[in-house]
């Protein structure tokens, strides 16, 4: 269900209705490339820090938490491929050591972004709340100086993700970066896994399926060593 209007705004009541509608009509995966700023995002960079704890988030956005809890606990079916719902959120792009909410909520899955070399993207939020990471691009790491056809120095962006964009008010495709691009990779893997499980007549409790995803994910910690060179000039 689309909950945002053309101005990237959403009313909380519409969001809650859409989430409940999804659960009641057979959806078992929420793909959510949105969220608030991390509680530890830097105000000096123009960010307004968001909630820092589950309690603070639930008090500030009680209807949102109620809707997500409804989906997590009521989506799916005891007689279907999965009992419960997967609420998958982008971790945020403030380069903060904590995911933003709702991604940081213990009932949701938080997705951080990695570059093509499996190291964290320069913008991605990270921390103990993150459950998965996936390709989200990193133009700062892959930006290569060059010249255009007129001999002007330009930056040629590489390593970004082909994504949906809004161009002049219309839906289009283009290259972008962010945890919003990483998150759909995990949602897609979850959907593929559930599709195969259905063919095999398997049934999972939601936590069983989450555990299976984590057990079969690729380890990336071994890539986190040495130095990472950036080519982008601020």
Residue ranges of each PLM-predicted region?
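Bimodal feature
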Residues: 1, 20, 24-27, 33, ...
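Substrate-binding/access-modulating region of protease and related hydrolase catalytic domains
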Residues: 1-105, 117-119, 168-185
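Acidic glycine-/aspartate-rich tracts in secreted/extracellular proteins
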Residues: 4, 35, 93-95, 115-117, ...
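Short, solvent-exposed loop/turn elements at domain surfaces
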Residues: 8-12, 119-121, 140-143, 221-223
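Non-transmembrane alpha-helical segments in soluble domains
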Residues: 19-20, 72, 88, 112, ...
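C-terminal subdomain of the subtilisin-like protease fold in secreted/lumenal serine endopeptidases
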Residues: 20, 27-34, 42, 83-85, ...
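Alpha-helix termini
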Residues: 68-83, 137-145, 197-202
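Extracellular S/T/G-rich loop segment that most often corresponds to the catalytic His/Ser-adjacent loop
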Residues: 100-195
